[in-house]
Design a protein with these regions (language model features):
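Acidic/histidine-rich, surface-exposed loop or edge segments in extracytoplasmic proteins
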Residues: 1
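…and closely analogous acidic/polar surface helices at protein-protein or active-site interfaces
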Residues: 4-8
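Metzincin-family zinc-dependent endopeptidase catalytic domain
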Residues: 12-190
Length: 190
């Protein structure tokens, strides 16, 4: 299990990223500096579970899945459907140790369902709605000493990145060489 402090560091980093208050926001040499923005989204840990019961650890539901690690299929077919909270009320995030078959994966997100957004697949099951991040990349080493975290992916950016997908954003290169990301104001990626 990762520490509460590691989880809090991740929420803090997410808020910095989405509110545009992170250190990168001040870097005028960054190519996206002129078009960055505060998207006015703030994340918090819920003080109650999906049934309205106060939680000993707000927003943290520690689940013993009786396994050392998880394959993506096991996550999608076992872990998520049995532990998901109402996705209309909660943003579901799972941290796991990926199985050897998925060991190179930092995380992944389910695109939103039935958005009508061009380029976003429809009919994603509600029972798997959310984001999965490997526990070694969850949190920000800039905000504490978390020995389980592994550089260079220890800055809390994996969840920020995957959350963008969860909101319906594709990679700016459209998952291909200068392909389409379906957002008109994204500068061309080279």
């Amino acid at each position: 299990n990762i520490s509460d402090e590691q989880i809090f560091s991740q929420i803090e980093r997410m808020n910095e990223d989405f509110r545009n208050t992170n250190a990168d926001a001040l870097d005028a040499t960054h190519p996206y500096f002129p078009i960055q923005a505060d998207v006015e989204i703030e994340f918090c840990l819920s003080p109650v579970d999906e049934n309205g019961v106060s939680m000993a650890e707000p927003g943290i539901d520690r689940v013993d899945g009786n396994r050392v690690d998880w394959s993506r299929d096991q996550i999608e077919n076992q872990l998520k459907p049995t532990t998901i909270w109402n996705p209309n009320l909660f943003y579901n995030i799972w941290t796991v140790k990926f199985a050897a078959s998925d060991a190179n994966l930092l995380g992944y997100a389910q695109f939103p369902d039935q958005t009508g957004l061009q380029g976003i697949p429809a009919n994603s099951p509600a029972t798997t709605d959310g984001v999965v991040v490997r526990y070694q990349s969850f949190g920000s080493a800039d905000k504490g000493n978390f020995p389980v975290m592994e550089a260079p992916f220890n800055k809390g950016r994996t969840l920020s990145h995957e959350t963008g997908h969860w909101f319906g954003l594709r990679h700016i290169w459209g998952d291909g060489v200068c392909a389409e990301d379906f957002v008109n104001d994204t500068p061309p990626h080279r």
